[in-house]
UniProtKB/Swiss-Prot annotation:
This is Helicase required for RNAi-mediated heterochromatin assembly 1. It is found in: Cytoplasm; Nucleus. It catalyses: ATP + H2O = ADP + phosphate + H(+). Its EC number is 3.6.4.13. The modification Phosphoserine is found at residue 94. It comes from the Eukaryota. Signal peptide: none annotated. Coiled coil: none annotated. InterPro entries: DNA2/NAM7-like, DNA2/NAM7-like_C, DNA2/NAM7_AAA_11, P-loop_NTPase, SF1_C_Upf1. ATP binds at residues 393-400.
Amino acid sequence: MEQVQDEIWKLSTLDAWEMVNKNTEVVFDEIPEPETLSEMKRHPLYSNIFNADNNTTSFTEQIETSETSKTQDSEGNKVDKNLKENKSIRRKRSIDNDYELSNVKRNDITSGKNREFENEHHPASDTSSWRELPSIPTLEELTSKSVELPSNNIYGGYKSFEDYLSIHYRLLREDAVSPLRESVLRYKVNPNYITGSSLAVYDHVRIDGYTISSSVIAAKLSFSVRAKKKIKWATSRRLISGSLVLLSNDDFQTFRIGTVCARPLSGLNKHPHEIDVKFEDISISLDPREEYVMIEATSGYWEAYKHVLRSLQRLSASTFPMKDYLVHCKSNQETAKHIQNNPRIRINSILKNNSQKIVNALEPFGPGEYILDSSQLKAYQSMLTKRLSIIQGPPGTGKSFVTLKAIETLLENTHSHVLPILVACQTNHAVDQILIRLLHQGASVMRLGSRTKDPEIAAVTIFQKAKHTKHSFKAAYNEIRHKKQRLIKQITNIMHNFNLEFVTLSYLHSKGIITTSQLESLRNNTEWISSVAENGEKTEEELISIWLGDAKVELITPSEITDGFEEELQIDPEKLEEIQKEAEDSGALMEEELRGKFINLRCKYLFSKLTTLHEKEIDTLLTIPNIWDIPEYSRGIIYCRWLESAYAAAEKELNRLYRFYLKVDRERIGFSNKRAAILLRGANVIGMTTTGLNKYRDILERINPKICFIEEAADVLEGPIIPAVFPSLEQLVLIGDHKQLRPGCSTYALRQDPFNLSISMFERLVENDMEYTRLTMQRRMHPQIRRLVSSVYEDLSDYEITKYWPSIPGMGEIRRFFLTHSRIEDNDGFASKINLFEAQMLVQFAVYLINNGVEPQKITCLTFYAAQKDLIERLLSESLNREKHFIKVATVDGYQGEENDVVLLSLVRNNDRTEVGFLSSPHRVCVSLSRARRGLFIFGNAQLVAESNPLWWDAINTLMNDETIQGLGDHLPLFTKDGTIYVNDPVELLDVNMRLTRK
């Protein structure tokens, strides 16, 4: 027990709790709830976690503090539970208080800004080695029992540029490494661990061969799944391209690290399953008999981190032009150099009726027929002129439209020396949308990275451009290609010697492993052979098979025992596609299926090693001239010794060639980058994701970019944006909304104070009183719906057209309604939550709307929980035929940036413990309430959520205080031809729908 306690002490309370029931893992998609914590504290195995010193209880303190804050207001008082009696009560507390980043007082901002700046090149304490860390986790990182991390005080400036980089690098790296480290520890504590929401275990893992292509040498692994359930590989989070896997044959005392570089479904659906992995050590292992256990951390995704980490390591204070803003939080009033030199610009792109106008960009534009509202015009001018421009765009305010107009104006006025303009977004979809609109305006655009199904974008990817463009260094490039081909041929020739049922004695002889007499004895002892074999000449492989006799043991992978399908590691297909696009790029490593020559090393037999022989006896047997004189019971062990020597000799030569291969590949990449830079200089706008910005930073730096726009900037961690500040950069434009979803990170503790990793650069700068522009006129929500978020966006006004959105057929004048109920939630058996009553009500209400003429594609069903999303999708499929089932179902986290006419929102949470989980997050609540244009219908426990968060309180108060239209009740009003019907049960709604369809 002491050993187990010693191993587990460093786990967070969440991870410790996941191991209470041996192989049956209880996992959470949010922090543990009070009853869970209480049970953990009573459990003897985990008592040391809660009774340790302050450092080891920080996780617990954070969790308990977080839970307490969910149900208390700013004075620590419980919210009055009686909504009916307190309709007129309104919180005086500002909603901004609920967005506070930590307990640091606002005066810390001022004190931080007044710090005396240190030497920019002075290294941060205890961080001298961070720039030398390798691109993959080290053995020490993955097995260490303690990790020292820097705090990240987001109020005020950093001590120095080095301190700034070091903090973000180390926190990002820990976010990437932590899931892997905890996976290793979890396996060590319980080697019989089956699976869970953050760790997957695979058995009987063997290297079956290698695919050798022009860009990678990848091992094909065969394996079985320990989950005891069938895997829906097409939508599983398991073994995604770019994920890291760890292989070990000694219970993870040591292990090899590999990157999944291909996951063809044809291979995954086999038994044993197959994937392609690139090992990160410069080593090729040939022995297919060696069996490993493989684990992966499914809660993190290494590919999303590694390019950012590498970019941060390469930044230098002497070539970073925006230290004053980003490091020291100085005022961002400076004008961009290119506009300072020539402030007179044409602004035709924002004028009505094809008008033309030249203005001084540094002065107010004055009256005119603009297609922008006043706040958009202010944001537009900021984008054109400021070195650092920060634009907050609340829902529906047209921030992407303003961005497009600013880029069009820059293209119309800017001299070629400041082109091309970089545009980076969090998602591939957002990048493609901007580029398509610019294409339609006649801009010369190019897309970096990502395969795409859109033909317009496909035509402007750098891969397509390169295919049709000649380059001046073709001869040098061809020389590198020929070098690579020669190396590939040498490598494949060596491997082919093992692409046989048995490695021949001729090969063993050629390597000096057996003697000439031993080789000849195999071929010449025909008398012995004829006594055990039938007619005819025998090949050398057949002779070896005869010689081995019963020492051959056929290799059989045990069958998998499965019961049902795995659900906990499923992922939304759109999200999976987005992740895969980030891992893949044309002509690069990550592929659905690798292109190249495959050398099959899979062996049919194992060879019996059972022997009571001592090493001296084995050494004697190895020298017997006639191998037929070796006793049959010893032949398996002797042949194994020969194989081990053969593998060792071949691997030594292969690894030598592999090092040359990698050296030549670096030359190839260097030429490819030069060629790409030449192509990119021909574009006016280059689009990519923020991951792509880091992946291709070496190329982009060659073209000396002057202007960079970051869309969705509040939804991106600070680390990936820092490298966007190229040495040549004159202007950085950040567009986003810090009131909506924050960036995601893998490790819960790192989101909290003092690490604050989930605070974006955008939010940090705004919170430090940096000047920013907020758009104030929304064009999405009907005013009735917009009022639900008025406590978040106090100055948000409505564009005139929103007042005249058509009403919802079958709902009279009701555009927003909260159906409150007390039906208890349930657990889906894993981590997520479901509420069957809400799902059934939601589905039947959707059917009702369709029966009244609402088009299915204009309805979105939203929920905070993945399991509820899956349940709603299943019920919709059962209730609607394929022709009608075009209803979008999504989680709130997956729907930011989207909108629809009608949104049906399932809150799920309903329990007697007053726990609401995700519903306590004001950022998620803000997103959920601001997606609908014409109708928003909420299903949940109004009393419960009102107590959880001031934003819910204000929204529910708004619904209750509307004297003209009912907004909240325990019965849902339906306006039918037969009159108004009130329902509060799915069966009642089903009955209404059946009557409607009969008519």
